[in-house]
Amino acid sequence: MTLLPKKPCKSKAKGLLLGALFTSFLLLLYSYVVPPLYPNMAFTTSEAAAPCSPIPNEPVAATPANGSAGGCQPRRDIVFMKTHKTASSTLLNILFRFGQKHELKFAFPNGRNDFHYPSYFARSLVQDYRPGACFNIICNHMRFHYEEVRGLVRPGATFITVIRDPARLFESSFHYFGSVVPLTWKLSSRDKLAEFLQDPDRYYDPSSYNAHYLRNLLFFDLGYDSSLDPASPRVQEHILEVERRFHLVLLQEYFDESLVLLRELLCWDLEDVLYFKLNARRDSPVPRLSGELYRRATAWNLLDVRLYRHFNASFWRKVEAFGRERMAREVAELRQANEHMRHICIDGGQAVGAEAIQDSAMQPWQPLGIKSILGYNLKKSIGPQHEQLCRRMLTPEIQYLSDLGANLWVTKLWKFLRDFLRW
């Protein structure tokens, strides 16, 4: 008599129970990792809000930049307001290298690679913060809160940020963050971005989870209300406030020219601003914005458009003051030096997809559900003169933060879970 196999009821029940427990754990972790969107403007208590107190007679800058005009001193106290999808990861690498080279003190987030974004920045979020502590460089993603940031740096600190054509920024943000913005899940077209732009008011809800990624993201990152009426006088007031607070607003589209101005402002050496493009996205199978869709994306992000137009104009005034011919010479010098380093450092001479990256230490962070961010392979035979610089120039943000001593336990746990679940 043939016995029928027993149904694995107990195994299924155990699997369901484990799945439920694991899901509950993920939800609990997620509720801790992702902060509320609109908390109070500042978390720091009045007792802990003591301003930065430099050590008496502590030098602000120790060594003059080689060949710098007028014997200026390199600036070492820098606040970089790291905006999203603006080549900011490339600029971050430049700041990491400079800070590491000169043994400067970074203000890092505690447990993550951002300051609990999209919450407003508070100095209490800084790793190992103590009232009165001073830091040289603040450069991780945050939602900007000027007073809180100001309390962590010396009075002479340089404030910089970078912006981008709002339509292009919207396109990049939509593709990168779309999978974690639930309002996009109802879009059924292959080209979800085009479908969204046909009637954005139909889909968009400013109170929806992560909706801030899909409208006026620059305005939001800088700490302002991204749902303001574009005709409101508050918009221009905010733009002028940014102009007063920031010494330089870089343009992503003119990144090399921006770095020349930044080098002049900070009195740095050419080597300090060399770079490889980091966190770049693989070409999408969906065509880039053009024509009518570009116009729709621009109209959808009018606050950012006003901000961009203002600082685009001021940027070119700075270029004129710097000198057009001098700018052309120094941009050519920077590009030649970058090309020289590319031949020395990069295996194959160009960025590759995630699947082709051989060293996990060079693997960039990927968006949920798709490996669209490019990275590099380091050449195996690099002379001792360039080996350290090459590795530092190519190291992605998360790995570099760890190298610099940042506590990233939440980010690393999240990566482990994503790898385990193959997200």
From Swiss-Prot:
SUPFAM superfamilies: P-loop containing nucleoside triphosphate hydrolases
Carbohydrate-modified residues: N66, N312
Transmembrane segments: 13-35
One Gene Ontology term from the biological process aspect of the record: glycerolipid metabolic process
UniProt EC number: 2.8.2.11
GO molecular function ontology, one term from the record: galactosylceramide sulfotransferase activity
Catalytic activity of the protein: a beta-D-galactosyl-(1<->1')-N-acylsphing-4-enine + 3'-phosphoadenylyl sulfate = an N-acyl-1-beta-D-(3-O-sulfo)-galactosyl-sphing-4-enine + adenosine 3',5'-bisphosphate + H(+); a 1-O-alkyl-2-acyl-3-O-(beta-D-galactosyl)-sn-glycerol + 3'-phosphoadenylyl sulfate = a 1-O-alkyl-2-acyl-3-(beta-D-3-sulfogalactosyl)-sn-glycerol + adenosine 3',5'-bisphosphate + H(+); a beta-D-Gal-(1<->1')-ceramide + 3'-phosphoadenylyl sulfate = 1-(3-O-sulfo-beta-D-galactosyl)-ceramide + adenosine 3',5'-bisphosphate + H(+); a 1,2-diacyl-3-O-(beta-D-galactosyl)-sn-glycerol + 3'-phosphoadenylyl sulfate = 1,2-diacyl-3-(3-O-sulfo-beta-D-galactosyl)-sn-glycerol + adenosine 3',5'-bisphosphate + H(+)
Keyword Membrane annotated: yes
Tissue: Expressed in brain, testis, kidney, stomach, small intestine, liver, and lung. Not detected in heart, skeletal muscle, and spleen.
Enzyme class, first EC level, given as a word: transferase
Annotated knockout phenotype: Mice homozygous for a null mutation of the CST gene born healthy and display hindlimb weakness from week 6 of age and subsequently show a prenounced tremor and progressive ataxia. Myelin vacuolation is observed in the cerebellar white matter, diencephalon, brainstem and spinal anterior column. Male mice were infertile due to a blocked spermatogenesis.
Function: Catalyzes the transfer of a sulfate group to position 3 of non-reducing beta-galactosyl residues in glycerolipids and sphingolipids, therefore participates in the biosynthesis of sulfoglycolipids. Catalyzes the synthesis of galactosylceramide sulfate (sulfatide), a major lipid component of the myelin sheath and of monogalactosylalkylacylglycerol sulfate (seminolipid), present in spermatocytes. Seems to prefer beta-glycosides at the non-reducing termini of sugar chains attached to a lipid moiety.
Name of protein: Galactosylceramide sulfotransferase
Species, as recorded: Mus musculus (Mouse)
